[in-house]
């Protein structure tokens, strides 16, 4: 879907595919980048640092720099899959392969002993006039910046009911990818407006004004991937005049 040239920040890539029954990604380390495997339906065996648990979609598991991961589909059905990669060095990818497909893991932890991301809509909370938009959005930050060691800043989940909107705003220090999890709606980036639906992905570069509107029916559910120019630096300016900040700049004490 995207590669290291798609954004100005350190996105490595975003891949989207199916994992067929008996398929997966073998066990490997990353030392200069971070990844997160996500499944959107079914279930799969996720491994982080040699410990394996079964997760059911929609869920993901971040793998930080210096750690290892794998995924295996032991079920009889294909699983919808995404892999997000963010690098420490722009354009640089690394992987140290352990030659272990993780296809016959006998001992699985019923409760994962690694970090996970759950995109269950029941976890969302109402936010009226989100970014000065119309109606009441449902929003949550699924993963914050301190989960990661790179400039990966967050994963947000946003549900816009029919005709509700995420108001016009921009970021000076953050780029985003909006991925449509469910439903349909309208996206505007700068002066371009397009209809979007499940499976679409919209990149938003630095300083680009953007807004979204939920369509009829079930509205518009989005996963938002945020990557900063520097670790822990995040900002939001509200439109249309961008005369003020919704949130002050935040700088990590550990950056």
Language model: regions and residue ranges:
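A short hydrophobic beta-strand segment most commonly corresponding to one strand
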Residues: 62, 77-93, 203, 218-235
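A short, N-terminal "cap"/entry segment at the start of jelly-roll beta-barrel domains
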Residues: 1-11, 92-152, 167, 236-255
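Short acidic-glycine-tyrosine-enriched beta hairpin
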Residues: 50-65, 191-206
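Asparagine-centered strand-capping/turn motif at beta-strand->loop junctions
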Residues: 71-75, 212-216
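Conserved short histidine dyad/triad with adjacent acidic residue
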Residues: 2, 15-30, 139-143, 156-171
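Glycine- and acidic-residue-biased ligand/ion/polar-headgroup-sensing regions
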Residues: 32-44, 173-185, 190
């Amino acid at each position: 879907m995207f590669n290291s040239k798609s954004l100005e920040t350190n996105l490595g890539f975003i891949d989207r595919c199916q994992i067929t029954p008996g398929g997966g990604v073998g066990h490997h380390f990353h030392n200069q980048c971070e990844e997160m495997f996500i499944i959107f339906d079914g279930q799969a065996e996720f491994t982080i640092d040699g410990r394996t648990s079964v997760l059911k979609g929609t869920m993901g598991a971040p793998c930080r720099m210096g750690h290892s991961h794998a995924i295996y589909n032991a079920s009889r059905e294909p699983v919808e899959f995404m892999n997000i990669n963010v690098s420490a060095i722009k354009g640089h990818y690394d992987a140290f392969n352990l030659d272990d497909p993780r296809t016959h893991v006998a001992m699985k932890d019923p409760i994962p002993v690694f970090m996970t991301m759950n995109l269950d809509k029941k976890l969302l909370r109402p936010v009226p006039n989100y970014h000065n938009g119309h109606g009441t959005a449902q929003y949550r930050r699924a993963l914050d910046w301190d989960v990661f060691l790179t400039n990966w800043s967050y994963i947000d989940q946003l549900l816009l009911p029919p005709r509700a909107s995420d108001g016009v705003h921009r970021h000076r220090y953050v780029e985003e990818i909006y991925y449509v999890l469910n439903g349909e709606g309208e996206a505007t980036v700068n002066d371009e407006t397009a209809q979007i639906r499940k499976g679409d992905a919209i990149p938003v570069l630095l300083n680009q004004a953007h807004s979204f509107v939920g369509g009829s029916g079930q509205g518009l559910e989005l996963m938002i991937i945020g990557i900063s120019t520097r670790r822990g630096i995040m900002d939001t300016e509200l439109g249309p005049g961008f005369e003020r900040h919704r949130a002050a700049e935040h700088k990590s004490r550990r950056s």
